[in-house]
Amino acid sequence: MSQYCIRIILVLATGFAVLVQPGVLSAQELDRYQVIVECTDTINRYAHTRDQLDSEGHASLFTEDGVMEFGGSITGREAIAQRLRDNDGSAMTRHMSGSIVVSIDDNDGITAHSYFHVFQANRPDSPGPLPAESYLMVEYDDELRMTDTGCKFAKREFKIIFMGQH
């Protein structure tokens, strides 16, 4: 394959692409982009699995000894899955992620900071748009690890920044 045909496009969650041509980025720099993309994907999948009440998928985003902190701590995949299973399903949520910043330090430690806008409403008896009954702006601080199965949360801490009612 010719040098002109070899191009790698990394699409980041922010919606822009980085075009990489041979010789432009080192393998190490390309690895950094791959880590950023994989960790951004993990952060976005957190929202989807949480909103769909997919407890196993949600827990799989964490390391075996992963920790969630939000006033208290939940440690381990099984405890994280159980927290979501304990949800009675009466409230519907949608987590909108944004402003995701993934950082890799000199020792390959991975951290991320992101915001989530969370809407909540009671589950409907019939289909159709729902009026949001409450909304939150949440800030997440993450410690992540690359594993054989991708980027995983080692620790996810969140705090509520804004809270409102409609």
Which sequence ranges carry the predicted segments?
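N-terminal secretory signal peptides that target proteins for export/translocation
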Residues: 1-5
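Bacterial N-terminal signal peptides
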Residues: 8-21
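Short beta-strand edge/turn micro-motifs at domain boundaries
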Residues: 23, 109-111, 135-166
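Short, low-complexity N-terminal intrinsically disordered segments enriched in polar/charged residues
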Residues: 23-48, 52, 60-64
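Transmembrane beta-barrel outer-membrane domains
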Residues: 37, 91-93, 133-135
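A solvent-exposed, acidic/Ser-Thr-rich amphipathic alpha-helical stretch
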Residues: 55-120
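Short, surface-exposed loop/helix-turn segments at secondary-structure junctions
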Residues: 124-134
